């Protein structure tokens, strides 16, 4: 099995613009958000569409949508993972 190439099209990141553009440069689908409502709509939509195997969400955005994060933990796919923002981990 060749593990030297990862299909980054199956990975998404949601967070403030400064963080997601760095991930976008690595080939991930980037979804910059600037409000809790926008984050809720974006993350819920990504989960519902099931087009990405892993959805990374910055910690600061995750704190704004704990209900969506909790709901996502009840299902196997896609995986939702919190990551530090450009300001670092909390």
Where are these regions (language model features)?
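Periplasmic-binding protein-like
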Residues: 53-57
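Short secondary-structure boundary segments
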Residues: 35, 58-60, 84
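N-terminal first-folded block
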Residues: 4-40
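Short coil/turn connectors at secondary-structure junctions
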Residues: 8-9, 51-52, 76-78
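Acidic, metal-coordinating helix/loop segments flanking the phosphotransfer/catalytic sites
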Residues: 41-48
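C-terminal structural segments of small proteins and small subunits
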Residues: 66-90
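Short, surface-exposed connector motifs at secondary-structure boundaries
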Residues: 1-2, 26, 50-52
């Amino acid at each position: 099995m060749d593990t030297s190439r990862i299909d980054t099209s199956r990975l998404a990141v949601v967070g403030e613009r400064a963080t997601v553009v760095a991930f976008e440069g690595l080939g991930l689908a980037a979804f910059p958000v600037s409000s809790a409502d926008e984050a809720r709509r974006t993350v819920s939509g990504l989960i519902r569409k099931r087009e990405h195997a892993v959805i990374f969400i910055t910690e600061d955005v995750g704190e704004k949508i704990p209900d969506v994060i909790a709901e996502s933990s009840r299902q196997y796919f896609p995986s939702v993972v919190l990551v530090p923002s450009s300001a670092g981990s909390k």
